[in-house]
Amino acid sequence: MTDKSIKELALSVGRPVEKLLEQAREAGLPQRTADDIITTEQQDTLVNYLKKVHGQESGNTGKIALKRKTTSTAKVASTSGKAKTINVEVRKKQVFAKPNPEQIAAEAKARAEAEAKARAEQQAREAAEQKARLQTEQKAKATLDAMRAAHQQDSAAQSAPKAAVVVEKRGGGTVKPAPKPAETLEQKKAREAQTAQLKATEEAARRKAAEEAQQRTLEQMRKMASKYSNDDATATIRVIDDSPLASGLVGQAYEDSFNQEDREIKRGGATTNPRAGKKGGRRGQEEQSFVNHNKRGLKSSQANKHGFEKPVKKQVYDVEIGSSIVVADLAQKMAIKVREVIKTLMKMGELVNQNQTIDQDTAALVVEEMGHNPVLVSDTQAEDNLLEAAEEARGEQTTRPPVVTIMGHVDHGKTSLLDRIRRSKVAAGEAGGITQHIGAYHVETDKGIITFLDTPGHAAFTSMRARGAKATDIVVLVVAADDGVMPQTAEAIDHARAAGTPIIVAINKMDKESADPDRVLNELTTKEIVPEEWGGDVPVAKVSAHTGQGIDELLDLILIQSELMELKASAEGAAQGVVIEARVDKGRGAVTSILVQNGTLNIGDLVLAGSSYGRVRAMSDENGKPIKSAGPSIPVEILGLPEAPMAGDEVLVVNDEKKAREVADARADREREKRIERQSAMRLENIMASMGKKDVPTVNVVLRTDVRGTLEALNAALHELSTDEVKVRVISSGVGAITESDVILAESSEAVLLGFNVRADTAARQKSDQDGIDIRYYSIIYELIDDVKDAMSGKLAPEHRETILGVAQVREVFRSSKFGAAAGCMVMEGVIHRNKPIRVLRDDVVIFQGELESLRRYKDVVDEVRAGMECGLAVKGYNDIKPLDKIEVYDVQIVKRSL
C-alpha cells in the first residue's frame, strides 16, 4: 500500500467516502475530509481496527480451524418394543494454535514445581503413615506378649502340684500323689482378676468386629437400595434393617437362607403343591382343593362348578392409537359399545358418528376418560421396520465421493460452469437459457469422483433448491462478479444453512470488464458469509465458465472440504437413496432419476419409492449409457416403476414384495386423505362466514408438465398468484402428455388447459378441435405465469375513473314555463358539456346528481360552453337551484385493470 487520499482509498476498496471517513474517525485517525492524505501506517491501523470490530484480532493469530463430521448409527427402543436404528451425526471443530516458546517454558516450569511439591507431600504423608503403623504394631505386640505371659504363668501355677508325685511302691507298694498345696487368697484373687481381664478384652474385640461387620453390611444394603426407586425395594431394606436379625452377618445369611416355600409359610400364606402351581388362576386352586378333599375322604362341593367366573375388577386395556382412528375401531379396542364412546365425545364437544375419523390427540383423551391406557404409535411403523432391516444388513463403511449442489441466482452461470467442468453443452439446449429441472452428473477428476446437482435459480423453484440442499454434502454458491448478491442468492444461503451444509463461493464471470469481486465479497459479508482471505471460514474461488479460469482451484477446494468431512457410506447391502426427478416418457413409462446414498443398486432389485414400487428393468447413467449397478453418490435413471414418484421421496430396495405393497398402499392412503382434505368442500362455519359476500372470480387451470419437480414448482407459483379479488384454482395437474380426459375436464370446468414441455396426443387434439378448447404450450416457466396473470386480469372488475370537465357558478335563477327553474351561470373553469352528468353543489356539498336538460348561449342551443363565458342551463328533474350554487360537469371513464 502507498500513501493516498481518502477519496482514492474509498474508490479502491469500493466503499462510500462518508462511510470510510466515519470509520477512520472511529479508529482515531486525524483525517476529516475526502482530500486528506492517509499514510501506509494509518491504513494498517484502519484495517486492524475493522478486523477487530468484525470479530478478528489484528495480525496473524497463528490458528487453524478444522471441522469434521462423523455419521454413525444407534439403536433405541421404539413404542412397539422393537429396536429402531437412527442416524447420529457428530460435528467437531478443533482449533490448533501455534505454540509460544515463552509460554511453553513457563508452563513446563510451573508443571515441574507442582510435581515436586506433590512428590514432597506424598513422601511426608507416607512417612507419617509408616510411623503410625509401626507404633500401632508395637502396642499390639506388647499387649499380646503381656496377655500370653499372664496365661503361661496361670497355667504353670495350676500344673505345678500335679508334677510332684512320689512313687513309693517298691516291690508291691501303692503309689500316692503328693498332697496339693493350699492356694493362698492373694493368688486366687490375682488369677480371677487376670481371667476377668482376658475375657473382657476378648469380648470387646469380638463386639468391635461384629459392629464393624454390621456397619459394612448396612452400608452395602443402603447402596443397593439407592439403585432402586420402587417402594418395595425400599420397604424390604427397611424391614431387614429394623429386624432383630440385622444385628450382624448372621441375620442377613438367615434371611437369605429361606427358599420360596419357607417364605410363604413364614408370611402366613398357603402352601401350594409344586405341580398345581403350573395351573393358574381360580381353576387351578379349585382342582388343588378337590385333590386335598379327596385325600381326606370328603366330597368336593366345587367338582361340578363351571370353570369361568366374571372378573370382579375392571379390565384396563392398552389401546394403540395411530395418527387417526375410526370411532367404531376405537370402541372395539376398548371392548365397549360405540355409543359409550360417542357419549364421551359429545361431553367433550365433538359431534361424530361411528364411521367418522378422529385425530390421535382426541382419541387419547377419550381413552384416558374411559379409564384405559392410550399407546401412541406411528403410522410409519412398517416403513421404520424396513429401514431398520436395511441398516442391519449393511457392511463396513468406506469413503464415498462428495455430492455437490450448484446454487445461485438465475442467469449467474451455474449450468455454464458445470458445462465447463463436464466439458459439455447443457446450457445451450435449455429453453430460454435457464435451468428448470434438477440435473445430476458425476465427474471423474485426477483426484477423485465428484457428483454435481444443478438446481434452477428462478424464484418459482424454491422447493427444488431446498431439496437439493438436503440431499447434498457441499453447496457451491455461484455469484456473478458483475451482478452481486441477488434474491435467489440469499435464498440459497438460507437453504444451505438450514440443511447444515458447508458453502464454497464461486465468483463467476471474472472475464468481464465490469467484474467487481470485492463488491461481491462485501455483499456476501452482509449475509454472514465471510471469506477465508478476510478472516472467515468460507473458501472462495474466482472462476470464469467462459475461459476456464479457476476451475481447477474450485475442484481442489471441493475435494479438500470432502476430505475434512470424512464422507463414508456402505457399498454393501440394499440400496438406499433419494428421488431427484421423475418424468413419464412415451413408450418407456415412468423414468426416475435417483441419487444412490447407501448400498448398491442392481438391475432386478425391487425398489420402493414413495407410493409406488416395482423392479428395476433398465438402468442408465446421466449420459444415457446402460449400466448394471450403481454405488453410493452415483446418479442413475431407472425404468420399472408403475408411476412417477414425487421428487424428494426416499428410495429403498426391499426383498419382500408383500411388505413393499403394504408400505406403498399405506403411503397412498395417507396421500389420498390429505388430498381429499385439501379439496373438500367448505364446512358449515365457512359457509356461514361467506354468506352475504359476492362470489370471487376464479381462473381454473388444468396443468400438465414433463417432470414432477416442475409440476410442484408451478403449482406453488400459481397458488401464490391468487388475490382477494380473483383466485387461481388448479383443477387437475399431472406428469405426462395431455390426454382426452384432460380436455373433457377443462371443458366441463371452464378451465384453461396448459402444457409445460409436453404435447397433446392425437385423441386430445381431435377432442379440443371439436369442442373449441384452446391448448397452450410453454417451455419457459415465467411465460406461463405471465399468461395466467393476464387471464386473471381479465376477470378483474374494471375501474371507474372520474374526471371533472368544468365548473359553472349560478348568478341568477329564472322561471321557464318549459323547463321550470333555469339558471344563468358563469363558467368558472373548464368546459360545460350538455350530454355529460352533473352535480349540484351548495356550500361545496353535493345536493343533487343528474344531467342537464338544456344548455343555451343566449337563445342558441349549444353543446358546450367554455370558461369565461355566460350560459343558461336547466337541470333535468331538479328545480331547487339557488344563486351561488355550483354546477359541476364530470365524465366517467372505465379503465381496464391488471395485476
Curated annotation (Swiss-Prot):
Name of this protein: Translation initiation factor IF-2
Region annotated G1, chain positions: 408-415
Functional description taken from the UniProt entry: One of the essential components for the initiation of protein synthesis. Protects formylmethionyl-tRNA from spontaneous hydrolysis and promotes its binding to the 30S ribosomal subunits. Also involved in the hydrolysis of GTP during the formation of the 70S ribosomal complex.
Predominant localisation class: cytoplasm
NCBIfam families with a match to the protein in the record: IF-2 (TIGR00487), small_GTP (TIGR00231)
Record keywords: Cytoplasm, GTP-binding, Initiation factor, Nucleotide-binding, Protein biosynthesis
Protein family (similarity comment): Belongs to the TRAFAC class translation factor GTPase superfamily. Classic translation factor GTPase family. IF-2 subfamily.
An example molecular function term from Gene Ontology annotations: GTPase activity
CDD domains from the UniProt entry: IF2_eIF5B (cd01887), IF2_mtIF2_II (cd03702), mtIF2_IVc (cd03692)
G2: region residues: 433-437
Sequence segments annotated as region (G5): 544-546
Region (G4): 508-511
Highest taxon of the lineage: Bacteria
PROSITE patterns registered for this protein in UniProt: G_TR_2, IF2
GO cellular component: cytosol
Binding site for GTP: 408-415, 454-458, 508-511
Localization in the cell: Cytoplasm
Annotated source species: Acinetobacter baumannii (strain SDF)
Region entry Disordered, spans: 115-137, 170-189, 262-309
Residue segments, region G3: 454-457
Annotated tr-type G domain residues: 399-568
